[in-house]
Amino acid sequence: MTKENKPRDIVIVGAGVIGLTTAWILSDLGLAPRIKVIAKYTPEDRSVEYTSPWAGANFCSISATDDNALRWDKITYHRFAYLAKTRPEAGIRFADLRELWEYEPKHDKIRSWNTYVRDFKVIPEKDLPGECIYGHKATTFLINAPHYLNYMYKLLIEAGVEFEKKELSHIKETVEETPEASVVFNCTGLWASKLGGVEDPDVYPTRGHVVLVKAPHVTETRILNGKNSDTYIIPRPLNGGVICGGFMQPGNWDREIHPEDTLDILKRTSALMPELFHGKGPEGAEIIQECVGFRPSRKGGARVELDVVPGTSVPLVHDYGASGTGYQAGYGMALDSVMLALPKIKLA
C-alpha cells in the first residue's frame, strides 16, 4: 500500500483550537493523508456551543500554575513567536501587554514568565492605578481567533486532512466508523462532559460574555484582575476589532446576551482605558458584535492522558479542559498528546 492510499487511521474528534492544533502537528510529521477530523462544528461555523471562535485569544497570566500549565504556556509562547515571525498571515502578532491586579497575583506564574517572556517588567507601585497592588508589562501575543482557526483549517485541507461534520453520541463511534483506526484523539472540550464513553463529571462551563468593538487605534492588551470582576481589552490582529470583556461565570449555561452585561463591560473597559472610546465612555462605543461562549473548564485542570476507546484496544488520547487557555496553552497540550500517541502510530 502506498503512502497516498493508506487508510485514515488517525482520528481526531473536535475541530476547536486544540483539535486543529493537534492535526497540524501530526500533519507536519507527514501524516495528513491518514488523518480524519470528526466534528459537529468547523471554523466556518458560529455557535455558542463552538467556543474557539469567540475567544479574545491572547497570552496573559490567566492560566494555572501547576507544572504542566507552566510548561504548556512556555512551549506555546515560543510557538507563537515562531508563527508571528514566519507566518504573519496566520493572524498572530507580537503585542504589548499591561496586566494589573487588585489582589495577590500567582507568584509561581510570574517567576516562570520572568525566565522567557520578552520585555517582562514589574510596574513600580507608585505607577499602579486605583486599588491595584501589583502589575507588570511584557511583550506577548494577540491572536485573531476566527482567522487563525480558518488558517489552520484551510492549511490542513490543502495538506490532505479529511474533515467530517458529524455529532457523535459515543466515542466508540469513531472506531465503528473507522475500523482501521490506530489512535483516537478526544479534543471535544466542553462536550467531554456529555460524550458517551467519556462523560467526565469534572468538566463544566465557565460562561463568558464579550463585546467586539471598532477601535483601530488600540494596539495594547490591557487586563485588570479585579476583586469582583476581570476586565480585559484585547485587540485582534488584521483589523479584527477589539474584544472587550468580560465575565467568568462557572457552571452557567445561559446562552442569552443581556444588555445590562454589555453596558457593564463597556463601563469597566472604558474606565480601564479611557482612550478606548475616545474619552466618551460607553456611549462612544461602536459595537460590531456581542458574543456569549462557554469556556471548557475542568476541576483539577486540563486532561492530557492516554486511555483506550471503551470496548476496544484502540488507544484514546484525551486532550481537553483548558478553560480559557486553549490558545495560550494549546500548542503545548497538543504536543503532549501527540507524544503520547506516537508509539501507537506507524510512521513508515
Curated annotation (Swiss-Prot):
Transmembrane segments: none
Top class in the EC scheme: oxidoreductase
Cofactor or coenzyme needed: FAD
Summary of the function given for this chain in its UniProt record: Catalyzes the oxidative deamination of D-amino acids with broad substrate specificity. Enables the organism to utilize D-amino acids as a source of nutrients.
Lineage of the species this protein comes from: Eukaryota, Fungi, Dikarya, Ascomycota, Taphrinomycotina
Annotated positions binding FAD: A15, I18, K40, S52, G56, N58, R295, S323, G326, Y327, Q328
Source organism superkingdom: Eukaryota
InterPro entries per record: DAO, FAD-dep_OxRdtase
Biological process, per Gene Ontology: D-alanine metabolic process; D-amino acid catabolic process; D-amino acid metabolic process; D-valine metabolic process; nitrogen utilization
Catalytic activity: a D-alpha-amino acid + O2 + H2O = a 2-oxocarboxylate + H2O2 + NH4(+); D-serine + O2 + H2O = 3-hydroxypyruvate + H2O2 + NH4(+); D-alanine + O2 + H2O = pyruvate + H2O2 + NH4(+); D-arginine + O2 + H2O = 5-guanidino-2-oxopentanoate + H2O2 + NH4(+)
Compartments where found: Peroxisome
EC code(s) of this entry: 1.4.3.3
Keywords: FAD, Flavoprotein, Oxidoreductase, Peroxisome
Species whose genome carries this gene: Schizosaccharomyces pombe (strain 972 / ATCC 24843)
Cellular component, GO, one term: peroxisomal matrix
Family in the record: Belongs to the DAMOX/DASOX family.
Name of the gene this protein is made from: dao1
The protein's name: D-amino-acid oxidase
Main location: other
GO molecular function per UniProt: D-amino-acid oxidase activity; FAD binding; glycine oxidase activity
Binding site for (R)-lactate: Y232, R295
Binding-site list for anthranilate: Y232, R295
One Pfam family named in its UniProt record: DAO
